[in-house]
Design a protein with these regions (language model features):
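Short aromatic-glycine motifs in intrinsically disordered, low-complexity regions
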Residues: 4-16, 87-88
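Helix-adjacent hinge/juxtasegments
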Residues: 55-78, 83-87
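Catalytic strand-loop segment that frames the active site of acyl-thioester-processing enzymes
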Residues: 17-61, 66
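Beta-strand-rich interaction surfaces with strong enrichment in secreted/lumenal proteins
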Residues: 10, 57-58, 102-104
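Short amphipathic alpha-helical segments enriched in hydrophobics
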Residues: 13, 29-32, 48, 74, ...
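Hydrophobic beta-strand-centered segment that forms part of the acyl-chain substrate-binding groove
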Residues: 1-3, 74-104
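Generic secondary-structure microfeatures
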Residues: 42-46, 71-74, 101
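Short coil-to-beta-strand transition motifs
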Residues: 14-21, 91-94
Length: 104
């Protein structure tokens, strides 16, 4: 699969606005003979609610939301790896992360 629109993403992912952090899948490779990978896009605008308090006058996307966007992309990739045989109720959970640091 080469990519996906927001409509195609919503058919696969349970997340919805404001917590769906994928706007487009640019590429998604699930060939079992190769390394599976995904390239996704989130359109971030200055109007995002989290910029109001993080940080006033110096907007920064919170690191935990960046991590969540990565987890959602990984979940989408997992769904594509399962393929058409997946149960429609299948969902991937991000179990956690250790020693994560966010730097500028």
């Amino acid at each position: 699969m080469s990519g996906a629109t927001i409509e195609q993403i919503q058919r696969v992912m349970p997340h919805r606005y404001p917590f769906l952090l994928l706007d487009r899948i640019l590429s998604c490779a699930t060939d079992p003979e190769e390394n599976s990978n995904i390239e996704a896009l989130k359109n971030v605008s200055i109007n995002e609610n989290f910029f109001n308090g993080h940080f006033p006058g110096h907007p920064v996307m919170p690191g935990v939301l960046t991590l969540e966007a990565l987890a959602q992309a990984a979940g989408y990739l997992g769904m594509m790896m399962i393929g058409e045989a997946r149960d429609p109720n299948t969902i991937f959970y991000f179990a956690g992360s250790d020693n994560v640091r966010f730097k500028r």
